Amino acid sequence: MSARAVWDFTTGDARRFCDRLALVIDSAEDFRQRGIESDFVLLLHSGATQFGARTLRGTKFDKPDAVDLAPAHELLQRFASMGGRIVVCGIAMERSAIAEDNVIDGATIERNVFVSSVALQNRGYAYMPIS
């Protein structure tokens, strides 16, 4: 038996993003302690797209009060090291001026993560919206 979920992150608020991602990681650890394997996929689009970028320089998020990406990147790396998959929306990247070579290691790019979301749900993944 495994716990399969697609976590649909759209929030651009760094505090909320990190808090919710920490809860996702906690959930995976909880399942592991119960002897249940987790198969988690994290989708990043809308405001959450920025957290999949290595740097915000030159993007639509490049502002004087831009978020510090380090805490989010640390959590994303931890999520990936546990076997989680990170998928960044190509359409959102284009709209945010985030180049493909500016995406964090371990993440993949899907042109339209709505397609990924529907496909995963049709394969039995629980849909978990995080806005």
Task: Go through each PLM region and give its residues.
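Secreted/extracellular ectodomain signature
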Residues: M1-S131
